[in-house]
Amino acid sequence: MARVKTGVVRRRRHKKVLKLARGFYSGRRKHFRKAKEQLERSLVYAYRDRRRKKRDFRRLWIVRINAACRLNDLSYSRFINGLKKAGIELDRKILADLAMNDSAAFAKIAEAAKKAL
């Protein structure tokens, strides 16, 4: 029986890795081993940062809400407590958007939160 080499399989595997490595710099794009190493690292970063993104946005929303609350003579924690007591169920993403783009509506929500305290 004849010996089977990995020519076609190897070429396909290399092409797949090099295709995913497009956009990398220098040898990390052209050389298979470096491309494979960088690709593994890149996938780890992507996995980690998909989770970190959620935390980062939540922190950003809280900073924006806090800044708008301070303009309405409230702290962030008292504002959130007032919302819970008033039964207003808006998430932080929506509240941050209102704080940035519609300050009049946010001021009304802040007043409702103050009354509930």
Swiss-Prot record:
GO annotation terms (biological process): ribosomal large subunit assembly; translation
Matches recorded under InterPro entries: Ribosomal_bL20, RIBOSOMAL_L20_CS, Ribosomal_protein_bL20_C
Keywords, alphabetical: Ribonucleoprotein, Ribosomal protein, RNA-binding, rRNA-binding
GO CC, alphabetical: ribonucleoprotein complex; ribosome
Pfam families associated with the record: Ribosomal_L20
Gene Ontology MF term list: rRNA binding; structural constituent of ribosome
Functional description taken from the UniProt entry: Binds directly to 23S ribosomal RNA and is necessary for the in vitro assembly process of the 50S ribosomal subunit. It is not involved in the protein synthesizing functions of that subunit.
NCBIfam families recorded: rplT_bact
Family membership noted in the UniProt record: Belongs to the bacterial ribosomal protein bL20 family.
PANTHER family: 39S RIBOSOMAL PROTEIN L20 (PTHR10986)
HAMAP family for the chain: Ribosomal_bL20 (MF_00382)
Protein name: Large ribosomal subunit protein bL20
Species of origin: Campylobacter jejuni subsp. jejuni serotype O:6 (strain 81116 / NCTC 11828)
Gene, per the UniProt record: rplT
